[in-house]
Each structure stands twice: as structure tokens, then as C-alpha cells.
């Protein structure tokens, strides 16, 4: 891996081997006005072909109504994902490269094209709220999320999240078809809460 600076930009170059597959990567960071744009491109040599993956994001921070706010917008392309919205069980099962990466915890999505957006609003110095949206461009389903982080007291923190999957049955976030009538594999709205004490 090579990390460097040049022309007021930061860059990384990577040559690696992962699970017997050669990988080439390049990434960079540059300032655009008062915002920051980051991007990474990875080429993976599988048994059959070179597969491309790409992520580009834009981030910006500002003060809104007296509160510190930071926002991020991101495009994610994963060449191992399934094309468009064909998430039938036989298509998923036949995608060995995708399934292997999901099982190893390298990927968490089925499709190829995604948009993401997030904001972090500092309501008070001890309370942050972050609305997030993860949108699958192939099947028009999404996951909406609101995260709350509250530093309750010295060494105490409360973390909470509300998750809302959006989309019709047969989509990634609306629920995948199982091949059985009226039975989809998905999740409904969810609520998570955690109280942590650090010592």
C-alpha cells in the first residue's frame, strides 16, 4: 500500500491478495470548495474476470440554526451484486462470489447500485441525532434510520436507533421472495437501545 500527497490531494494505491484473488485499488481525497470528496476504486481478479467496485462520497459541515451539522452523500457500486431487481432465490444461490463475500462479512448488500445520505445534528454538545437513508437504485427499496447518541453523564452513554425498511415485497429492503407463496424473507421496523457504562 502506498499513501501519498500531491497537487493538494491525498491518495492511496493498493496491490493485494485476498482469498487467492489479486486486488488493485486506488483512492483519493480532495477539497471542493468547503466540502470534501472521497473516492475508492477496487478491481478484483476472480476466477472468471476482473470485477470493479467503486464508492464516491461528498461531505460538508455547517452551522444550522445554531447547531453543528455534518452531511454526507454517497454512491456505491459493487460489481459482485445482482443486476437490477432480480433477487429470486435461484439467482441469489447461483451467485457464489456474492454469497461468499456476504458470509465473510465483506458485503452487506445484494444489488449493484446504491445511494446513501446521512446527517449528524448536534442538538446539544451531549446529544447527537443522525438521520440516514440507504437506497437501492436497482429495485427502489430503501432503509431509513434515525440514530440517537446521548452522553448521559460522565462515563455513561445512551445509544438508540429506529430502522424502517421501505419497499414492496420482492425487493431487498421490502422482503425477498422465498419461492413459497405469500412468504417473504425480510424485517419489519426495528428499535434498538443500549445504555453503556465505561470504566
Identify the residue ranges that each predicted region occupies.
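Residues on the lipid-exposed face of transmembrane beta-strands in outer-membrane beta-barrel proteins
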Residues: 2-4, 26-30, 39, 56-60, ...
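Residues that define the transmembrane beta-barrel architecture of outer-membrane proteins
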Residues: 5-7, 20-24, 50-54, 67, ...
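Repeated loop/turn-to-beta-strand initiation elements of outer-membrane beta-barrel proteins
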Residues: 6-12, 34-38, 65-70, 125-130, ...
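Transmembrane beta-strands of outer-membrane beta-barrel pores
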Residues: 6-8, 15-19, 32-34, 43-47, ...
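Extracellular/periplasmic loop regions
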Residues: 36-122, 171-183
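C-terminal hydrophobic structural anchor segments
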Residues: 110-159
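Outer-membrane beta-barrel "beta-signal"
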Residues: 162-164, 182-199
Amino acid at each position: 500500500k502506498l499513501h501519498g500527497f500531491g497537487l493538494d490531494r491525498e491518495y492511496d494505491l493498493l496491490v493485494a491478495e485476498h482469498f487467492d484473488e489479486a486486488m488493485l485499488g486506488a483512492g483519493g481525497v480532495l477539497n471542493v470548495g468547503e466540502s470534501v470528496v472521497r473516492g475508492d476504486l477496487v478491481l478484483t481478479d476472480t476466477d472468471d474476470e476482473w470485477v470493479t467496485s467503486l464508492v464516491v462520497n461528498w461531505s460538508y459541515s455547517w452551522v444550522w440554526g445554531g447547531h453543528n451539522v455534518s452531511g454526507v452523500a454517497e454512491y456505491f457500486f459493487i460489481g459482485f451484486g445482482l443486476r437490477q431487481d432480480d433477487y429470486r432465490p435461484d439467482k441469489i444461490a447461483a451467485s457464489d462470489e456474492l454469497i461468499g463475500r456476504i458470509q465473510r462479512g465483506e458485503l452487506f448488500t445484494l444489488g449493484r447500485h446504491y445511494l446513501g445520505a446521512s446527517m449528524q445534528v448536534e442538538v446539544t454538545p451531549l446529544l447527537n441525532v443522525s438521520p440516514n437513508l440507504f437506497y437501492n437504485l436497482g429495485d427502489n427499496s430503501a432503509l431509513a434510520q434515525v440514530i440517537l447518541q446521548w452522553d448521559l453523564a460522565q462515563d455513561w452513554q445512551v445509544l438508540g436507533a429506529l430502522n424502517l425498511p421501505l419497499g414492496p415485497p420482492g425487493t431487498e429492503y421490502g422482503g425477498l421472495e422465498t419461492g413459497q407463496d405469500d412468504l417473504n424473507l425480510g424485517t419489519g421496523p426495528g428499535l434498538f437501545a443500549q445504555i453503556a457504562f465505561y470504566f
